[in-house]
Curated annotation (Swiss-Prot):
Keywords: ATP-binding, Chaperone, Cytoplasm, Isomerase, Nucleotide-binding
Residues that hold ATP according to the record: 29-32, 86-90, 413, 477-479, 493
Protein name: Chaperonin GroEL 1
Enzyme class: isomerase
Amino acid sequence: MPKILEFDEHARRALERGVDALANAVKVTLGPKGRYVVLDKKWGAPTITNDGVTVAREVELDDPFENLGAQLTKEVATKTNDIAGDGTTTATVLAQAMVHEGLRAVTAGANPMGLKRGMDAAAEAVGDALKEAAREVESREDMASVATISSRDSVIGDLLAEAFDKVGKDGVITVEESNTMGTELEFTEGMQFDKGYISQYFVTDPERMEAVLEDPYILLHQGKISAVAELLPLLEKVIQSGKPLFILAEDVEGEALSTLVVNKIRGTFNAVAVKSPAFGDRRKAMMQDIATLTGGQVVAPEVGLKLDQVGLEVLGQARRVVVTKDDTTIVDGAGDPKDVEGRVNQIKAEVENTDSDWDREKLQERLAKLAGGVCVIKVGAATEVELKEKKHRIEDAVSATRAAIEEGIVAGGGSALVHAVSVLSDDLGLTGDEALGVRVVRKAADEPLRWIAENGGVNGYVVTTKVRELGLGNGFNAATEEYGDLVAQGVLDPVKVTRSALVNATSIAGMLLTTETLVVDKPEEEEPAAAGHGHGHGHGH
């Protein structure tokens, strides 16, 4: 396929136009008084959002060269979103400012490679300064403040602080759409997985259609259980102990299942059978998680255990197990806390090492189930458009709060960057083009604060000058249009979000500035429509 090429200054200017198109669409959403962007959808109602990455993902430009610039800037937003889950608009604004400043320097004769080296060094120095300025998230109020700033809603902030309070920093918090108007929290303690009872005859509470076992023994079996002869020796020991039995196996069928059901109906003893969750290797891993949590062993031939030869020593225990038709919850497993902690650390190491997003998500789920519990935030709103917008904000706030717990918090509202670049005052001791690169980053660092102010209807240049004169931790609160101690006012940003935004923006801006050639496919010329012959008059014989 033929290509079109663009070189040097023309190439960089085309990229800049693309960056501007995307960044101008995104930056209006920045700050507490940021505006909304309406996105047209092929079907259904349009989406209204102020989430930077959602806007960025929708932008495709007509000019292929400009589109390259827009797509590269989109990468800034998505990468920041992947790492920190928030701060996508800040990253886009920083990238645009660095591209503008950098191109001005290149046009004036600076060497792009020298510029890039200076920019990278500056980003690293500012990142370190941000980390040093950070303080740990100590209280529930801190979490509520971070979530409130991210979601622009104090009710959501309080709700998320409560959620993190309950599940801890490793716990899973999921956001779901609700049919009601309000937003509420549902908490599941213990380990929950989505498999229910094999037969509804196991139900102990007919009103709620639940099977509840208090202080049961837990049998974990890797294969299928169909022959009752395999199960009988163990069953007899369990009946003698007087405790109920919870069975988790690939399947329980045939006479083994009917024996359990008949004994349950007669009241001889209480048991519930459930199919094990997931498939393949993940099933084995989850069974091992449950074994660690309950202090039992997985009965499997590969570890030399056969069902008809084992006793009570392989069974796990828990305070209670609740089984519905769709899911099972194990509360207070009797496993050794040290073993559970070891298992948690092992899964954390796997999370670090995996390249697959899907694997990472599934590992995080396993981690949460072992480490704390699961919180579901049910989001409600008057219309579907509002519901989607609210859900976006809450998802961002969850990510921001998690990032804050991880690396700590700094003063928000763009002021942390303005103060952190003071470490660049001597150009890091660099000279020439590298020093110019440092200045590019120093100038760009004002832009997020400037746009937060501009979107609030205040002159951004006046605000950035004033904030620079104030001490560390002080800044401009765009919601109240006052200057002051932002930390005390609860205007906080997670360091991880601000740092990721800066590092990713510097990376992409550096790539754009050092670009010399663009290569795109030549658009195909549309062929004129063929004349309408070809109406065959064939007759079937």
